Amino acid sequence: MNSGRPETMENLPALYTIFQGEVAMVTDYGAFIKIPGCRKQGLVHRTHMSSCRVDKPSEIVDVGDKVWVKLIGREMKNDRIKVSLSMKVVNQGTGKDLDPNNVVIEQEERRRRSFQDYTGQKITLEAVLNTTCKKCGCKGHFAKDCFMQPGGTKYSLIPEEEEEKEEAKAEGLEKPDPTKNSSRKRKKEKKKKKHRDRKSSDCDSSDSESDTGKKARHSSKDSKATKKKKKKKKHKKKHKE
């Protein structure tokens, strides 16, 4: 029974002390352990019962069991002492300290504090964003933070820049760009023109080659004819003589 006087930590073991205690009560969130030489009981939360996940503490311990624990926390709340114990950092067979440098305990404490800070900030922000101002009727702020003058312009939350950018991107994907299409058409037309020019140049070169061949053949025929005429003239002269 509490006599009305605030509890003190004088009879409690020192921080990080290892001792063997008896299980006094088992709940859904952990087990209460009797502290030797003290009327106070300490709580082993289910997250500190084992290195594995524990959903039901009653599957790990039962009332009257003797367990090895390590005192990992002592704090005063509303004139009452809250004692935190851990089973997973102590060998349950020998009572040996499995975390002599308290590394695991410090990591657990850091994680717990960061989680509390994050959830607190999240709840506060959601409460503010979902609040409707009684003064101007807009969402996102309280009446005490409203700067609207009587008869003035009302202002509400504007959409984030990222949302606007995403909408613009979606519109850009839906609507085809006419400049891109025209540039593609121009490129195709240029390729066709180049192909035509190459064909015409090839034809011209073949025609010129055929013309030169014909001229060469014609000139060779003329030279042969002149030679034959000369031979005939010489033959006539000899015959006269």
Curated annotation (Swiss-Prot):
Domain S1 motif positions: 16-88
A Pfam match: S1
Biased composition (Basic residues): 182-198, 226-241
Keywords: Acetylation, Metal-binding, Nucleus, Phosphoprotein, Ribonucleoprotein, Zinc, Zinc-finger
Subcellular location: Nucleus, Nucleolus
Residue(s) carrying Phosphoserine: S114, S183
Gene3D superfamilies documented for this protein: Nucleic acid-binding proteins
PROSITE patterns per UniProt: S1, ZF_CCHC
Biased composition regions of type Basic and acidic residues, renumbered to the chain: 166-178, 211-225
UniProt name for this protein: Zinc finger CCHC domain-containing protein 17
Natural source organism: Mus musculus
Lineage, uppermost ranks: Eukaryota, Metazoa, Chordata, Craniata, Vertebrata
